[in-house]
Amino acid sequence: FEKIVEIEDLVSINKENTEITKLNESAGVEKVKLSNLSYDILKKGIEYSKLSNGSYDITIGPLVKLWSIGLEGAKVPSKDEINEAIGYIDYNNIEINDSTKEAFLTKEGMEVDLGSIAKGYAADEVVKILKQEGIRSAIIDLGGNIYALGSKNSDNNWNVGIQDPFSDRG
């Protein structure tokens, strides 16, 4: 799926030279011009952060980085590390400009992580393509983010399990 690769190449924080990696590296230093797609995902992330009063906050990057979730070397960080990272988390410290599609993280050390919203955005794009192709039933798994389209078959709904986060993966 080319669309998924396109989105990942723009907004992943686990790849070098993505637009969001550049934004994070420029935190507290300078504005970054974004593509329409990256800007739209960032703006939607800010909107959801506001709607949840920060319970969902796209500037969670420093905290996510501590855990290294999904990467080699994943660990549970210390309380001190967590408390330090929390000081960088505040979506109100993102400035955006709709006319120039520029974004600025006002505090050095801030990091945006659009992984959750980008995966949802990518899933929505895949669903559009599948529906255009006449597919009415599918499970889309984008790194643990699941989209269930339709039902398993005419008699059964999809069953989705949730793994205990403290058990071994398997």
Show the residue positions of the predicted features:
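Mature catalytic core of soluble alpha/beta enzymes
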Residues: 1-170
